[in-house]
Curated annotation (Swiss-Prot):
Its EC number is 2.8.1.4. It catalyses: [ThiI sulfur-carrier protein]-S-sulfanyl-L-cysteine + a uridine in tRNA + 2 reduced [2Fe-2S]-[ferredoxin] + ATP + H(+) = [ThiI sulfur-carrier protein]-L-cysteine + a 4-thiouridine in tRNA + 2 oxidized [2Fe-2S]-[ferredoxin] + AMP + diphosphate; [ThiS sulfur-carrier protein]-C-terminal Gly-Gly-AMP + S-sulfanyl-L-cysteinyl-[cysteine desulfurase] + AH2 = [ThiS sulfur-carrier protein]-C-terminal-Gly-aminoethanethioate + L-cysteinyl-[cysteine desulfurase] + A + AMP + 2 H(+). The active site is at C456. The lineage of its organism: Bacteria, Pseudomonadati, Pseudomonadota, Gammaproteobacteria, Enterobacterales. It is an enzyme of class 2 (transferase). SUPFAM superfamilies: Adenine nucleotide alpha hydrolases-like, Rhodanese/Cell cycle control phosphatase, THUMP domain-like. Residues 61-165 form the THUMP domain. Belongs to the ThiI family. This is tRNA sulfurtransferase. ATP binds at L183, I184, K265, G287, Q296. SMART domains: THUMP.
């Protein structure tokens, strides 16, 4: 099988040296992502495209899907590469490829040509289009908005029959810009802002401030791992978790009610800046949107920024909530965000929307900054690739089974779309569907006399959810890995 990778247009307008660097980085990223599917595949870069050739036909759909999620790719073409002798030979090969698709449809032919030939692209379009129109009685030519566009590419003595075109996510290849640290909470905003910086070519590390126990951290780990695995797995990134409960306790005890929200955000920026400096990261990323909550007014945002010299990027600053939720739905983080455990330990009864710098600084004089230094020093830093392994260690008390007993039921916790695409059927045992984002509210409604074997494709989500359910007191939970 063969895929032609078309570059994001902004890459093609760069200077020659920058363009070559971007293409080289994108080629490496593609290799890093696809080696998990087929170690023998070949990735070859050219000036205006990248070729991917693989032998394992069983991995075709997986490879195609992975390519559409790699930043820097505008679209991909799935092609059949064949030799040709003349223009009539091109027509015959196009007829064999497209006959069934064109029956009863309107169509047009579009040709791109590279190399020296005795014919032009327009001449090929007319010849092939006329031939298809004559040989397929139910088809007719329509040059504007046809049902089917027959895409052909002629390169020297090779004909590329384009079997399908699939849109990528665009943007710049990860690694072409510098690293950033995303302050991730697991909600709609931080997930979308992290994705937007990945799409713009940044390697995104994650910093999580734990305000409320293990359940919240488990949920945020799921989001971070999902984002990395789906859009950024070409690079290693860090997941840094900071236990912020001591800081929250100090704020509740020492800070005036109306100033708590701004002070908490300033403490988070201070802590994140220390982490960024430790690992040589150039900027922080937050999901703040102007006016969304009391701490996100211009006055308050300026005061929050003042505590650090580190650049703070806010890609969602002008977005409304509906737009953010729509983006979360597109990238697949909406279900995580809707069911994310929330912690409301620092909510002022009357938060200020226009904090005064002198007053904020006076409140912070009462704060014991050694507490902040201590929690940063004790921060848990893991390679995001190890989250699955670490989760496996943490849920060692949750048994992993490959078979099943008479009282066991397999619980498929994949999303509804994944279940529809690839239904799970296991002979000799019942399979019940309950998407992971409904477990926290619906698992208790299931028959608790049964033993539930949680299953997902890779096993990461099932282990995380098993740990969560165990913490909620459910002992009838195991992880199913056939």
């Amino acid at each position: 099988m063969k895929f032609i990778i078309k570059l994001f247009p902004e890459i093609t307008i760069k200077s020659q040296s920058v363009r070559l660097r971007f293409i080289k980085i994108l080629t490496g990223n593609i290799r890093n992502v696809l080696k998990h599917y087929d170690e023998t595949l070949a990735v070859v870069r050219h000036w205006d495209n990248i070729e991917v050739r693989a032998k394992d036909e069983n991995q075709r759909l997986a490879i195609r899907d992975a390519l559409t999620r790699i930043p820097g790719i505008h679209h991909i073409l799935e092609v059949e590469d064949v030799p040709f002798t003349d223009m009539h030979d091109i027509f015959e090969k196009a007829l064999a490829q497209y006959r069934e698709q064109l029956e009863g449809k309107t169509f047009c032919v579009r040709v791109k040509r590279r190399g020296k030939h005795e014919f032009s692209s327009i001449e090929v379009e007319r010849y092939v289009g006329g031939g298809l129109n004559q040989h397929i009685e139910s088809a007719r030519v329509k040059l504007t908005n046809p049902d089917v566009t027959v895409h052909l590419e002629v390169e020297d003595d090779r004909l590329l029959l384009i079997k399908g075109r699939y849109e990528g996510i665009g943007g710049f290849p990860i690694g072409t810009q510098e690293d950033v640290l995303s302050l991730i909470s697991g909600g709609f905003d931080s997930g979308v802002s992290s994705y937007m910086l990945m799409r713009r070519g940044c390697r995104v590390h994650y910093c999580f401030f734990n305000l409320g126990g293990a359940a919240h951290e488990i949920g945020v780990r799921q989001v971070a791992h999902y984002l990395w695995n789906r859009f950024g797995s070409s690079h290693r990134v860090r997941f840094v978790a900071i236990n912020f409960e001591p800081v929250v306790g100090e704020i509740l005890e020492k800070v005036d009610d109306g100033q708590m929200g701004v002070v908490l955000k300033r403490m988070m920026v201070r802590a994140a800046s220390k982490v960024a400096e430790r690992y040589g990261v150039q900027a922080l990323v937050t999901g703040e949107a102007l006016g969304q909550v009391s701490s996100q007014t211009l006055t308050n945002l300026r005061l929050i920024d003042n505590v650090s010299d580190t650049l703070i990027l806010r890609p969602l600053i002008s977005y409304d909530k509906e737009h953010i939720i729509n983006l979360a739905r597109q990238i697949g983080t909406e279900d995580f965000a809707r069911t994310m455990p929330e912690y409301c330990g620092v909510i002022s009864k009357s938060p200020t929307v226009k904090a005064i710098k002198a007053k904020i600084e006076a409140e912070e004089e009462n704060f014991d900054f050694s507490i902040l230094d201590k929690v940063v020093e004790e921060a848990n830093n893991v390679d995001i690739r190890e989250i699955a392994q670490q989760t496996q260690q943490e849920v060692v008390e949750v048994e992993t089974v490959s078979g099943f007993g008479p009282n066991d039921v397999i619980l498929d916790i994949r999303s509804v779309d994944e279940q529809d695409d690839k239904p799970l059927k296991v002979e000799g045992v019942d399979v019940v569907s309950l998407p992971f984002y409904k477990l926290s509210t619906k698992f208790g409604d299931l028959d608790q006399s049964k033993t539930w074997l949680l299953w997902c494709e890779r096993g990461v989500m099932s282990r995380l959810q098993a740990l969560y359910l165990r913490e909620q007191g459910f002992e009838n939970v195991k992880v199913y890995r056939p």
